[in-house]
Amino acid sequence: MLVNRRYTAKGKNLPASPKKVRPIADNIRGKSYVKAIAVLCSMPNKGAKLLEKVVKSAASNAMYHNKNLSEDMIFIKMVMVDDGRRRKKIWPRARGRADRLVNRNCHIFVEVDEKKDIKG
């Protein structure tokens, strides 16, 4: 019988645009933990560093709750990047005008999974 165990981690209101983080998340979805960390470490993007922290946190949660689990047995089940809070600022322009500057944040949700066979 195959039993799935899932462990999660969330990063809320992280200072990066979701539009820039989603392509990075697509690169690691479905990969093993070791490969995902290798891919994220090699990327120079700010979003990759944020995603790396959340993935490491999810793997750490998994290894904390299941002592028999190793890094090789973990893979990335799901990565979700959603819009976070937006900070709007006024940007003064010429001739007394003003533009709005929107700073976007994102929420990152990572779910890791481990599979093991149970006989009986």
Curated annotation (Swiss-Prot):
The answer to whether the entry has keyword Metal-binding is no
The entry's keywords: Ribonucleoprotein, Ribosomal protein, RNA-binding, rRNA-binding
Which cellular components does GO assign to this protein? cytosolic large ribosomal subunit
| MF (Gene Ontology) | rRNA binding; structural constituent of ribosome
| GO biological process, any | translation
Q: Which cysteines are joined by disulfide bonds?
A: none
Domain of life of the native organism: Bacteria
- In this record, what's one Pfam family? Ribosomal_L22
InterPro entries per UniProt = Ribosomal_uL22 (IPR001063), Ribosomal_uL22_bac/chlpt-type (IPR005727), Ribosomal_uL22_bac/org-type (IPR047867), Ribosomal_uL22_CS (IPR018260), Ribosomal_uL22_sf (IPR036394)
Mind telling me which PANTHER family this protein's record contains?
CHLOROPLAST 50S RIBOSOMAL PROTEIN L22-RELATED, LARGE RIBOSOMAL SUBUNIT PROTEIN UL22M
Q: Which HAMAP family match?
A: Ribosomal_uL22_B (MF_01331_B)
What is this protein for, i.e. what is its function?
Answer: This protein binds specifically to 23S rRNA; its binding is stimulated by other ribosomal proteins, e.g. L4, L17, and L20. It is important during the early stages of 50S assembly. It makes multiple contacts with different domains of the 23S rRNA in the assembled 50S subunit and ribosome. The globular domain of the protein is located near the polypeptide exit tunnel on the outside of the subunit, while an extended beta-hairpin is found that lines the wall of the exit tunnel in the center of the 70S ribosome.
Can you state the subunit structure given in the record? Part of the 50S ribosomal subunit.
Family of the protein in this entry: Belongs to the universal ribosomal protein uL22 family.
What is this protein's record name?
Answer: Large ribosomal subunit protein uL22
Question: Which gene is transcribed and translated to give this protein?
Answer: rplV
